[in-house]
């Protein structure tokens, strides 16, 4: 374990943005686009837990694995707590145990690029307009905040927030699969 110092703040921020994109891509693929808000929330919780734990106990030898496991466990815990667990399981897949195994496989180094590419196609779904595609991609895959996106696109923060919220709702209602499109669709 390595100690976490104030000077490593920029590295930690970069690491978290990078890992956040991987996690959101993999977990959305596993649990479905309808769960993207829960997934983003639980990834943030895992990141906060990491910051707190690492300040006290140092950075683990494999910080990526630590965050991946924490985020996955938070989502599984949240799904177990849902009032309509049967509905959650039917939306998420066959069983939570099967989902857990799938997530482990998809978090492997070989699978991460595919998951990110799949998520990029979801963020750029043809039902979304170009500006919304850009905002959703910057938020979901690049880890930018609403204010950063708004500043870059020269739009009010609230406009960006609403676009991203509507895009997630639209993709969820359409139950867009987190898969690669057919070659003739590209």
Residue ranges and their predicted role:
Residues 4, 142-159:
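Helix-turn-helix DNA-binding module
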Residues 10, 93-119:
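Acidic, proline/glycine-rich intrinsically disordered inter-domain spacer in sigma factors
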Residues 41-48, 61-73, 162:
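Structural recognition of an alpha-helix C-terminal capping motif at a helix-to-coil junction
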Residues 23, 27, 67, 71-79:
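Hydrophobic-face residues of short alpha-helical interaction/recognition segments
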Residues 5-14, 24-43, 53-61, 157-158, ...:
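Short, charged helix-capping/linker segments at alpha-helix termini
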Residues 68, 78-100, 179:
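Short, basic/polar amphipathic helix motif occurring as a linker/hinge flanking DNA-binding modules
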Residues 127-144:
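Short amphipathic alpha helix immediately N-terminal
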Residues 153-174:
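DNA-recognition helix of helix-turn-helix
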């Amino acid at each position: 374990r390595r100690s976490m110092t104030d000077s490593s703040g920029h590295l930690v921020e970069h690491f978290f943005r990078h890992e956040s994109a991987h996690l959101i891509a993999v977990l959305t693929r596993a649990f479905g686009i309808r769960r993207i808000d829960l997934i983003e929330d639980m990834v943030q919780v895992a990141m906060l837990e990491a910051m707190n734990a690492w300040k006290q106990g140092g950075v683990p030898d494999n910080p990526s694995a630590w965050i991946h496991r924490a985020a996955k466990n938070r989502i599984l815990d949240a799904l177990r707590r849902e009032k309509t667990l049967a509905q959650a399981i039917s939306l998420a897949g066959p069983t939570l145990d099967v989902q857990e195994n799938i997530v482990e496989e998809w978090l492997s180094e070989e699978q991460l690029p595919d998951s990110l590419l799949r998520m990029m196609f979801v963020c750029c779904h043809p039902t979304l307009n170009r500006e919304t595609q850009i905002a959703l991609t910057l938020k979901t895959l690049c880890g930018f905040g609403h204010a950063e996106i708004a500043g870059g696109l020269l739009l009010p923060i609230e406009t960006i927030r609403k676009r991203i919220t509507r895009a997630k709702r639209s993709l969820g209602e359409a139950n867009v699969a987190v898969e690669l499109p057919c070659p003739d669709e590209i």
